Every structure is written in structure tokens, then in C-alpha cells.
Amino acid sequence: MDNTIIIPYSDVEPKKEWLWKYRLPHKNVAFLYGSSEDAVEALIAQIIASVSMGRALAVDNMNRQAGRVIYQDFKDGQIDAVKASLERQKADCSNIAYVNFNCKKAMECIQELEKGIEEFQPSLVVLRNISQCMEKQKDLYDPLKMAPILHRLMLYATRYNCSILLAESKPRICYEDTYFALTVKSVMQVQKSQQGCFVLAQTRDALKQKCEVVKFKLDAQKTLCWV
């Protein structure tokens, strides 16, 4: 019988899994924000398209199988625009769905979201503009209002073996807030560079896996191209 109690760290195998290496952790919650609606929308569409088709993402080169995605934009009247954005990135829309909510309030929507996740079994869940269904948009920045939502999303990510990405424009969230820091493992920001490109940088990394910035451009049709 092996009674060894000393284990060298060289024998330790990392257990963390990634949907997008060092940016979108598996079974966890990430946050994406930026001042450009077009850039954030195109980046989300590119991520979703890559997952739906089983393609590698920039500076990733991970071999992945095609997976399902729930893409929920809480702004009214966005379904046609979302589909057009996904088609521009050559996504497989048969692997992408949204939940037809019977409610309007944020927490009720999040509770109902679980049924959609359980039924569709997505690899990725993207929730965009969730502030639109909160009582006040500024409630997104209130830790007491966001804590139960974030806690429930973290449960979904672990229970249903998926990554969850929250996306907003121009947030004022304090990333060091206890509830936010305990739940959201990766925070990414889209910024415009002087060269006319957009830069995706990680502004917070709770998993201690720093990753290099990536750049992309938008063409006249708002289609994303990696630089």
C-alpha cells in the first residue's frame, strides 16, 4: 500500500477547463463590457459562431466539438438583429437558441432560464443587456440586487456544465465587490485602439491565468476579423 504523503507539484494536473482558453472558464461566469455596442455585438457573435461550429477562437487553437448556445438579449426587438449578426459570422443557428420568457423581471427571468438550460443543454449561455429587465437599470451596479442573480447563475454553470457570459456596455460595476468577485471569474473589456482596431483585454482574472490581448476589426457589414 502506498503511504506517500508528499506529492511534488510537478505531478499536479490542472483541473480547470476552458471554453475559450484563459478567457471563458468552463462551469463558471465571465463578464464582457465595452463602450462600442457594435464591437461587443460582433465579438459575442464570433464567440457564439465558433462554439456552434466547433471552430478555434483567436490565440486559442483548442480543438473543440460543435456545441449549443443560448443567446439571450434582454433588449426588446433584438431577435432579427441578433440572427443577422450570427449569420454574418457564419454561425450554425440550429445550435443557437433563446428563451421565450413568460415574465419581465430579472430574477424571474433568471429562474425561468434554468428550464431552457436544462432542456437545450448548451455549452455556453450569453446574457446580454440584463440591466434592461431590472427594475432600474442602475440596479445592475447594486450588489444587493445582483448578488442573488450572480449566485444563481454560478449554480447553473456548475450544475449544467456550461460557461455563462454576461455582457453589458459601459458598466460601473465595482469588480472588487465581494459578491461580484466571488462569482465572476473573468472580466474582459473591449477598447478601441489608435490603429482603428478594437482590443480585447482581461481586466480581472480570479483564476490567475493571464492571457495576452487580442485585436480585431469590423468591416463595413460589422463582421469581425481578427488582426
What role is predicted for each listed range?
Residues 1-91, 180:
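The Walker A/P-loop phosphate-binding site
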Residues 1-26, 93, 107, 111, ...:
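Core recognition of P-loop NTPase motor domains used across DNA-transaction enzymes
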Residues 18, 80, 111, 151, ...:
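Residue-level marker for well-ordered alpha-helical positions
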Residues 31, 37, 41-42, 72, ...:
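Phosphate-binding/switch region of NTP-binding enzymes
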Residues 49, 114-117, 151-154:
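A structural alpha-helix within SAM-dependent methyltransferase catalytic domains
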Residues 58-59, 93, 97, 164, ...:
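Secondary-structure transition/capping residues
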Residues 62-148, 218-220:
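Conserved inter-motif catalytic segment of the P-loop NTP-binding fold
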